[in-house]
Amino acid sequence: KEMQNQSSHWLTIRKEKPDWVIMWGGGAMNPTAIKEAAKTRFPLDRFIGNWWSGAHVDTEALGSKAKGYLASSFTTTGTDFPAVQDVIKYVVKPGKSKTEMGMPGKVLYNRAMFNAVIIAEAITVAQKMTGKKNVTGADVRLGLENIKLDEARLKELGLEGFTAPVIGSCADHENGGSIFVQQWDGSDWKRITGLIPPMTDVVQPL
């Protein structure tokens, strides 16, 4: 309930006039914040959310009122990828999924699909490394630490340009952490930047 009661915070923002507002949000907090920002006339192209704060569920109901709002992401929206087209053709259209036809291509659907790709790749790597058909949790962890979703493999899977390469290791479970920025155009999310690497030399010592 409290996440939907933001008026006083946005009145403070209107008074102090910051150059940018960054939102680490989730759930009902996101559309409420975007709505309040628009109501107080804060420029939405100066309002950016983290990757929890930039899905279709956060902006669709607001439509053009949310136009300009920014969010980070690590998977691209849309269905213009062979892998997504195959999911639609072989899974969604034949009725083998509870997903509605309009869901593939949206932020959360594509992100969940890529999560499934990572797990499937980890299992495959684990099977190859251990020689087992039925792998254990420890085996899959080994697979995750040796996963290699480089540009060539992403292209082979039908996901060229979909996300940053994912190269697993014990030392780096974040895989570098690169993201890009997407923007709501009033009806859909559009990717507006290339991949942006984190400033680990600045952040990690903190």
Regions found by a protein language model. Give the residues of each.
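Sec/Tat-exported extracytoplasmic proteins
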Residues: I13-K17, I22-G25, A37-R41, S73, ...
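Extracellular/periplasmic Venus flytrap/periplasmic-binding protein
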Residues: K1-T40, G78-Q85
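Extracellular/periplasmic catalytic domains that process cell-envelope and extracellular macromolecules
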Residues: R14-E16, K39-R41, A61-K65, N134, ...
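Active-site-proximal beta-strand/loop segments in catalytic clefts of secreted hydrolases
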Residues: K1, M23-G27, G49-S53, S72-T76, ...
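Extracellular/periplasmic periplasmic-binding protein-like sensory domains
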Residues: A37-F114, L195-V202
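Segments of small-molecule ligand-sensing domains
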Residues: K96-Y109, A120-R191
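Extracytoplasmic/periplasmic, Sec-exported soluble proteins
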Residues: E2-N5, W24-M29, T79-P82, P104-N115, ...
